């Protein structure tokens, strides 16, 4: 079939398998160009490995460090008449390229919050790898099914305490609007922590540890975002921030446990990037369009892949073997360039000036839109979007 982009809200409902493969190839090429990571991991589990930072982590491990990888994700395959999710095609492409280089690659399509997912991964590790030396936790899910009761819990992207009103961009109509978000209830805050906090990360490490499949020096990392006062009301000071603070709590507990055998647990605070997850957060698209333009001008721009390669090579797996620099809460900070005072001051000054008319001139909004559509495999140079493609793509994946 011929597949064209169809956008609804902040999601593109169609995906292009050839475009998604090209995205993965581009990240692999970038990783290889940067060279091998001297003390990199060799057997890596990525929970949430099909897009964004999780996918880049799997690529950094495999193509930057020749690691065997197991990827866990929840995606929909395509059929003969309907495209699957971008994450499905990304994972299929990763598997194809990894196997072509003789790298071990196993993928599990399942609910990562479930007991079954953890048991299946343990089984695979015991059978094929013996143990693993790194666990990346990179889940971005709006819903969590509690593994014991089966109850569905939903997260809320809402402020706490008072209604939040701010200048934002309507990405469908490409115009500046005033976005208003009502505050979260106590229940919504608690539910957001349940879905997006550190509990499931702890359950993963507990299951892996009890099964005896964590190597002595195993490192685990979970991803977070803090941002600045421009986005704090909706993010760090909102319901989502409470969940991210719970990740810090979990990291502390896990670090105590793992450091006893030479391992470590850290939260890595990353920069804002264009992902399906960030596009759903009110105000983030406009902030990203502003900050990206300034960071590009300063030569500091990084996408997911550049960020993660820097985290692997300059923080977690340094050539000199030293421990990564951390902040006072033991977090690895890769938002350092974004938070530079001159960059943030630029955004603060710009925010009140942006109108629908000058949006594309003052910010990188056009580039934001292009990067967003690229997540789904569209708008990539060298791909013939009028060509007939088969949306049904099979690969070596275990379905639970």
Curated annotation (Swiss-Prot):
EC number: 1.3.1.9
Gene encoding the protein: fabV
Function of the protein: Involved in the final reduction of the elongation cycle of fatty acid synthesis (FAS II). Catalyzes the reduction of a carbon-carbon double bond in an enoyl moiety that is covalently linked to an acyl carrier protein (ACP).
EC class: oxidoreductase
Pfam families associated with the record: Eno-Rase_FAD_bd (PF07055), Eno-Rase_NADH_b (PF12242), Enoyl_reductase (PF12241)
Entry's family note: Belongs to the TER reductase family.
Keywords: Fatty acid biosynthesis, Fatty acid metabolism, Lipid biosynthesis, Lipid metabolism, NAD, Oxidoreductase
Reaction(s) catalysed (UniProt annotation): a 2,3-saturated acyl-[ACP] + NAD(+) = a (2E)-enoyl-[ACP] + NADH + H(+)
Molecular-function GO terms, alphabetical: enoyl-[acyl-carrier-protein] reductase (NADH) activity; NAD binding; trans-2-enoyl-CoA reductase (NADH) activity
Record flagged with keyword Repressor: no
GO terms classed as biological process: fatty acid biosynthetic process
Assembly notes: Monomer.
Protein name in the entry: Enoyl-[acyl-carrier-protein] reductase [NADH]
Gene3D superfamilies assigned to the protein according to its UniProt record, in alphabetical order: NAD(P)-binding Rossmann-like Domain
Binding-site residues, substrate: 225
NCBIfam families with a match to the protein in the record: EnoyACPredFabV, PRK13656.1
């Amino acid at each position: 079939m011929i597949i064209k982009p169809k956008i609804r809200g902040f999601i593109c409902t169609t995906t292009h398998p050839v475009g998604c493969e090209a995205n993965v190839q581009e990240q692999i090429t970038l990783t290889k160009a940067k060279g091998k990571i001297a003390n990199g991991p060799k057997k890596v589990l990525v929970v949430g490995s099909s897009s964004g930072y999780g996918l880049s982590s799997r690529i950094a491990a495999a193509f930057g460090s020749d690691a065997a990888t197991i990827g866990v994700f929840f995606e929909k395959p395509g059929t003969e008449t309907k495209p699957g999710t971008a994450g499905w095609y990304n994972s299929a492409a990763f598997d194809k390229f990894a196997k072509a280089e003789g790298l071990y690659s196993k993928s599990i399509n399942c609910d990562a919050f479930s007991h079954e997912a953890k048991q299946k991964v343990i089984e695979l590790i015991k059978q094929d790898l013996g143990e693993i030396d790194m666990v990346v936790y990179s889940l971005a899910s709006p819903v969590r099914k509690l593994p014991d009761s089966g109850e569905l819990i939903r997260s809320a992207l809402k402020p706490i305490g008072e209604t939040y009103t701010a200048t934002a961009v309507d990405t469908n109509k490409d115009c500046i609007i005033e976005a208003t978000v009502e505050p979260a209830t106590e229940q919504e805050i608690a539910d957001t922590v349940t879905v997006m906090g550190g509990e499931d990360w702890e359950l993963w490490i507990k299951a892996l540890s009890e099964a005896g499949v964590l190597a002595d020096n195993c490192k685990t990392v979970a991803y977070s975002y803090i941002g600045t006062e421009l986005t704090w009301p909706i993010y760090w000071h909102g319901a989502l921030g409470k969940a991210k603070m719970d990740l810090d709590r979990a990291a502390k507990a896990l670090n105590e446990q793992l450091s006893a055998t030479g391992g470590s647990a850290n939260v890595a605070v990353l920069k804002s990037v264009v992902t399906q997850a960030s596009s759903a957060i009110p105000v983030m698209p406009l902030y990203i369009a502003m900050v990206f333009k300034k960071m590009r001008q300063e030569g500091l721009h990084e996408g997911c892949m550049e960020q993660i390669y820097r985290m692997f090579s300059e923080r977690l797996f340094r050539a000199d073997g030293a421990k990564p620099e951390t902040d006072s809460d033991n977090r690895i900070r890769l938002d350092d360039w974004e938070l530079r005072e001159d960059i943030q001051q630029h955004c603060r000054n710009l925010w009140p000036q942006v109108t629908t008319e000058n949006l594309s001139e003052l910010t990188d909004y056009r580039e934001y839109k292009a990067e967003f559509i690229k997540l789904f495999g569209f708008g990539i140079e060298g791909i013939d979007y009028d060509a007939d493609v088969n949306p049904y793509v099979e690969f070596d994946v275990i379905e639970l």
